[in-house]
């Protein structure tokens, strides 16, 4: 019985050490995101609605002062552009621009910049190692706040620190995914 207890205590100490390593790795990676001055991202965004899912392919250019997201697919929406500056959203297509007002929630137009903001400023709820599609990943769950309520951003990061997959949840429901 004593040998079993010794092994359990040793395992607990090893696991505690792994948790510290993961937290340190997460903080180091988040610091890299805080220092970033520009980013270009491409992703497949799926919006999970009550009755259906809608998928878009987007390209996003981000700087600390704003971001522009352009829909590249499906073809009938290709070229639609959303510009995000602070809390303001402008949608444009074929030269015409329309102020879409204030962003209150995470949406396909702002989820990639939201992901970067979450990596910089979000409250780290959880950090751990996981496998995603055969790749070892660092998984972070980051709590962010929006005027429309809390958004939990869960992101799986590859060995180079780049996001491989992200989920955005509101009211315990996944509303958007990015891959």
Where is each model-derived feature located?
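Gly/Pro-enriched, hydrophobic low-complexity segments
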Residues: 68, 125-179
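Beta-strand elements of well-folded, non-transmembrane domains
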Residues: 45-51, 62-66, 73-75, 95, ...
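Short, surface-exposed coil-to-beta transition loops
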Residues: 53-57, 77-80, 148-153, 175
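Sec-dependent bacterial lipoprotein signal peptides
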Residues: 1-16
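N-terminal leader/targeting segments and the immediate start of mature chains
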Residues: 16-65, 76
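A glycine-biased structural micro-motif
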Residues: 38, 79-81, 134
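An acidic-aromatic
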Residues: 59-114, 173-174
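Flexible, processing/modification-adjacent segments and terminal tails
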Residues: 34, 43, 47, 91-147
């Amino acid at each position: 019985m004593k040998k079993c207890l010794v092994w359990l205590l040793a395992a607990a100490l090893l696991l505690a050490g792994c948790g510290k390593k993961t937290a340190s790795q997460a903080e180091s990676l988040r610091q890299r995101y805080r220092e970033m001055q520009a980013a270009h991202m491409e992703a497949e965004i799926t919006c999970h609605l009550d009755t259906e899912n809608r998928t878009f392919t987007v390209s996003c250019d981000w700087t600390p002062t704003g971001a522009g997201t352009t829909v590249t697919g499906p073809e009938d929406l290709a070229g639609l552009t959303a510009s995000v500056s602070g809390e303001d959203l402008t949608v444009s297509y074929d030269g015409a621009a329309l102020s879409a007002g204030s962003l209150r929630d995470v949406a396909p137009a702002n989820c990639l910049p939201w992901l970067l903001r979450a990596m910089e400023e979000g409250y780290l709820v959880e950090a751990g190692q996981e496998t995603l599609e055969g790749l070892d990943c660092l998984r972070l769950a980051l709590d962010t706040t929006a005027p429309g309520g809390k958004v939990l951003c869960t992101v799986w990061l590859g060995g180079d620190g780049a996001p491989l997959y992200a989920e955005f949840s509101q009211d315990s429901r996944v509303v958007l995914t990015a891959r």
